[in-house]
């Protein structure tokens, strides 16, 4: 198993960094290719991540041809033949996002069987919203032995109100609705850029999806969808991670091809803190002087609020800003596990229900720490850059799910960082 070693204390990042295609966009895009009963679908700007390999294998398991050209960051999918209706447990069980294949398989075949991903229970909010929406469209749902089975000879258009704007549920229902009879309206839909990207692909495939990026989606069902070519949007979370890295190291970094509008919630908090953030022709430039930054209060919310996937990294930034900052997590429960690891590095923090209080500007020391999830992995590495001494970050399987050559990109910006194999 690999580990990352960071020598910190005087790191100051500078230069340019290239952002990959968005992990949170490409996974549902790959699921959408299942719907194309004619021709091939080509996705470009595909990131080389373990989650992408997993989703490719989920789609392959349906007897669909998938060709991943890593050198050119391109995936070609041919789903034009008959496809299977059961997603492979071996791969579905590895990744929560794999549940988004349920809607496309059901819409295409009239029957779908998918194991519950990641061991989550049927009553948990995200899975519940997926199933309620499909039931509203006429599907019969059963759960036996950890498997979800959905049956509908033909899905019917429906009006669906979501109790929470779940990204995954919105994506699943959008895809299912493209081949349903009639019109489907999704109220309180998720508004993330990844939703818009999916809608663009579906429309390029011949679907009729309107309202993406707003709270109300209207999907008029069509008889069939066909292959197309589509470029995956840039990863706003990777871009945000490097913005935070530049800010907390008093750096000067150009995040190439980052999209200002996609990152506006994060940028607004960086500006409030005193970070210099500017849009340039080639991306977003971040300059900072940590000694002049001010503490802030942050609350994670569904888009266009502050992204929960930036919460851990922003905590790392708060740790170096003198004064008392707070960050409230309203999207996911139990997402402060990284703070326990950061306390090993000298972080002073308290957690009261869904809010963490961060006492920033105090000395941090290098330590041996373990990643608890994908974004926590990045946060611990960033903290290691500003802590005195050496930090060793283990359990990198989380990191590889969402960041491509993260340590190499940081090293090119000036970080003293390496990745080594543990004996």
From Swiss-Prot:
Pathway: Cell wall biogenesis; peptidoglycan biosynthesis. Belongs to the EPSP synthase family. MurA subfamily. This is UDP-N-acetylglucosamine 1-carboxyvinyltransferase 1. One of its GO terms (cellular component) is cytoplasm. UDP-N-acetyl-alpha-D-glucosamine binds at residues 96, 125-129, 309, 331. Keywords: Cell cycle, Cell division, Cell shape, Cell wall biogenesis/degradation, Cytoplasm, Peptidoglycan synthesis, Pyruvate, Transferase. The modification 2-(S-cysteinyl)pyruvic acid O-phosphothioketal is found at residue 120. The gene is murA1. It comes from Streptococcus thermophilus (strain CNRZ 1066). GO terms for biological process: cell division; cell wall organization; peptidoglycan biosynthetic process; regulation of cell shape; UDP-N-acetylgalactosamine biosynthetic process. The keyword Cell cycle applies. SUPFAM superfamilies: EPT/RTPC-like. Pfam families: EPSP_synthase. Cell wall formation. Adds enolpyruvyl to UDP-N-acetylglucosamine. It is found in: Cytoplasm. PANTHER family: UDP-N-ACETYLGLUCOSAMINE 1-CARBOXYVINYLTRANSFERASE. One of its GO terms (molecular function) is UDP-N-acetylglucosamine 1-carboxyvinyltransferase activity. Signal peptide: none annotated. Phosphoenolpyruvate binds at residues 23-24.
């Amino acid at each position: 198993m690999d580990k990352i070693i960071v020598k910190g204390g005087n790191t100051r990042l500078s230069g340019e960094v290239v952002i990959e295609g968005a992990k949170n966009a490409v996974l549902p895009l790959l699921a959408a290719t299942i719907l194309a009963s004619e021709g091939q679908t080509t996705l470009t700007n595909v990131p080389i991540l373990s989650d992408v390999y997993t989703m490719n294998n989920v789609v392959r398991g349906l007897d669909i041809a998938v060709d991943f050209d890593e050198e050119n960051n391109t995936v070609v999918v041919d789903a034009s033949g008959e496809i299977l209706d059961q997603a492979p447990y071996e791969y579905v069980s590895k990744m929560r996002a794999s549940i988004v294949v349920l809607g496309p398989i059901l819409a295409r075949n009239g029957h779908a069987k998918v194991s519950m991903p990641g061991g989550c229970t049927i009553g948990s909010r995200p899975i519940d919203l997926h199933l309620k929406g499909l039931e509203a469209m006429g599907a019969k749902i059963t759960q036996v032995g950890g498997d979800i089975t959905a049956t509908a000879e033909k899905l019917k258009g429906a009006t669906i109100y979501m109790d929470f704007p779940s990204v995954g549920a919105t994506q699943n229902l959008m895809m299912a609705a493209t081949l349903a009879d009639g019109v489907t309206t999704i109220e309180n839909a998720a508004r993330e850029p990844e939703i818009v990207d999916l809608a663009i692909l579906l429309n390029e495939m011949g679907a009729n999806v309107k309202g993406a990026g707003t709270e109300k989606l209207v999907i008029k069902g069509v008889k069939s969808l066909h292959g197309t070519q589509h470029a995956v949007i840039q990863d706003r979370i990777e871009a945000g991670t490097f913005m935070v890295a530049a800010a907390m190291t008093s750096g000067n970094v150009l995040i190439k091809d980052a999209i200002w509008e996609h990152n506006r919630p994060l940028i607004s908090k960086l500006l409030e803190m005193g970070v210099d953030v500017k849009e340039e022709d080639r991306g977003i430039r971040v300059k900072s002087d940590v000694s002049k930054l001010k503490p802030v209060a942050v609350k994670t919310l569904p888009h266009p609020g502050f992204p929960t996937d930036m919460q851990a990294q922003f905590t790392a930034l708060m740790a170096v800003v003198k004064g008392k900052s707070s960050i409230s997590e309203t999207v996911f429960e139990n997402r402060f596990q990284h703070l326990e690891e950061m306390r090993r590095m000298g972080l002073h923090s308290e957690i009261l229900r869904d809010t963490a209080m961060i006492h920033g500007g105090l000395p941090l020391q290098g330590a041996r720490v373990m990643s608890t999830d994908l974004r926590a992995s990045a946060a611990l590495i960033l903290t290691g850059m500003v802590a005195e001494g050496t930090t060793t970050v283990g359990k990198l399987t989380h990191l590889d799910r969402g960041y491509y050559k993260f340590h190499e990109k940081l090293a090119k910006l000036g970080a003293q960082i390496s990745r080594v194999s543990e004996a």
